[in-house]
Swiss-Prot record:
Keywords: Acetylation, Chlorophyll, Chloroplast, Chromophore, Magnesium, Membrane, Metal-binding, Phosphoprotein, Photosynthesis, Photosystem I, Photosystem II, Plastid, Thylakoid
Record's comment on post-translational modification: Photoregulated by reversible phosphorylation of its threonine residues.
GO BP: photosynthesis
Membrane topology term: Multi-pass membrane protein
Cofactor binding, note field: Binds at least 14 chlorophylls (8 Chl-a and 6 Chl-b) and carotenoids such as lutein and neoxanthin.
Organism of this sequence: Spinacia oleracea
Positions bearing Phosphoserine: S3
The protein, known as: Chlorophyll a-b binding protein
């Protein structure tokens, strides 16, 4: 699942 932490951009 996707980790919701730091933005990829």
């Amino acid at each position: 699942r996707k980790s919701a932490g730091k933005p990829k951009n």
